[in-house]
Amino acid sequence: MDWQTLLTRERLGKPVHSNDELGRSAFHKDHDRIIFSGAFRRLGRKTQVHPVSSNDHIHTRLTHSLEVACVGRSLGMRVGEILRDELPEWCDPSDLGVIVQSACLAHDIGNPPFGHSGEDAIRNWFQQAAGRGWLDEMSDAERSDFLHFEGNAQGFRVLTQLEYHQFDGGTRLTYATLGTYLKYPWTSRHAESLGYKKHKFGCYQSELPLLEQITQKLGMPQLDDEQWARHPLVYLMEAADDICYGLIDLEDGLEMELLEYSEVEALLLGLVGDDLPDTYRQLGPRDSRRRKLAILRGKAIEHLTNAAARAFVDQQQALLAGRLGGDLVEHMHGPAKLCVQRAKAIAREKIFQDKRKTLHEIGAYTTLEILLNAFCGAALEQYGGHTPSFKSRRILDLLGRNAPDPQWPLYRAFLQVIDFIAGMTDSYATEMAREMTGRSSPV
């Protein structure tokens, strides 16, 4: 791979890239299109790790995505400055920052309500549906898309098909930004066989022609049938997510009183050492722990960002060859790598086991089971031109102009249902499930 091709400004759905406006490049337009999309806006009412809370300090998918985008921009700009002489003459180092920032903004845009619990619930429902014979009309590859449902593949569909120009390029982002978004540039046929990325994939069968087009435009080498090497900038987006995930989980753990401030402080001090800002040294006992943590977190992110940028530059040849094993965190050195790994371990041991989170996950399964039974059941009932019951007709009416056609293949009809359900916020999904079961909230 080479940077000239990897950083193309050409857009999906348009034969040539549009002219840059004064102070606004093609990549800035990508950023703006994502920010103003309905799918991005709805992240504000979707679970990050913990249930959407009355405590406004707890992260949602939206605040998490914004923070990841900030770190991703810094990573892209630092790498761009270091590699300035290797970039195309029309490309400014800051362009790398905007590309990575945009991909970071969109990295969770396909996640269903209730976060990873929602993904698990959808996969579990389709496994049961397969046992009932509901998926028998599909090919093995199509059936696999549902059995391995993945927010990353749904996000790719949102960006390339559903938002703005429906089924005509979607958001029509540049190929460079789409390539940087594609964390897993392969289909579900590889979801069981790729080591540390096991169970992950980034593209449904319905979007495979678009994936082929994008990888061809970017010069991403094909490794196997329906599998391509990753765009190098994906590793910066992934590192930004890892950095924020690790630190954000600890902050939320403190807010929910699942962790002691002293253990979080010790972890971050182990990373930054004596490199503390004067504002931190001047803090006294009357200063809040939130203020202390904010200052310490900022310095920690600086250290982790520097370490990730160094790892990227050190591994540039392997990245361009499409053969880097693992993620950038694995290629960091010293305290930075240990900090991220230890932060994730603390989250697994002390945060993810919280009773409130467990109850939320159980509720997610119940809610999504109700919705999938209703909408997929109605789509199945009318499949092949059969006349659905009155109830099923009313259920399909809720989809409006996006309701599946009775003559469509069942794969396409179920995808249309998933588009609707995966796009819901936690609160909307919960309320609709309540109303469908006759248990709507009292007026």
UniProtKB/Swiss-Prot annotation:
Q: Can you give the residue ranges of the HD domain?
A: 61-246
Do the record's keywords include Metal-binding?
A: no
- Of which family is this protein a member? Belongs to the dGTPase family. Type 3 subfamily.
Give the matching Gene3D superfamilies.
eoxyguanosinetriphosphate triphosphohydrolase domain-like, Hypothetical protein af1432, putative deoxyguanosinetriphosphate triphosphohydrolase like domain
Q: Which UniProt keywords apply?
A: Hydrolase
One GO term in the molecular function aspect is: dGTPase activity
User: Which positions carry the signal peptide feature in this UniProt record?
Assistant: none
Full protein name? Deoxyguanosinetriphosphate triphosphohydrolase-like protein
Query: Known Pfam families for this protein?
Result: HD
One GO BP on record is: dGTP catabolic process
- Give the matching PANTHER family: DEOXYGUANOSINETRIPHOSPHATE TRIPHOSPHOHYDROLASE-LIKE PROTEIN 2, DEOXYNUCLEOSIDE TRIPHOSPHATE TRIPHOSPHOHYDROLASE
Matching entries from CDD domains are given as:
HDc (cd00077)
User: Would the keyword Hydrolase turn up in this protein's UniProt record?
Assistant: yes
Q: By its UniProt entry, which SUPFAM superfamilies does this protein fall under?
A: HD-domain/PDEase-like
> InterPro entries, per this entry?
dGTP_triP_hydro_central_sf, dGTP_triphosphohydrolase_C, dGTPase, dGTPase-like, dNTPase_3, HD/PDEase_dom, HD_domain
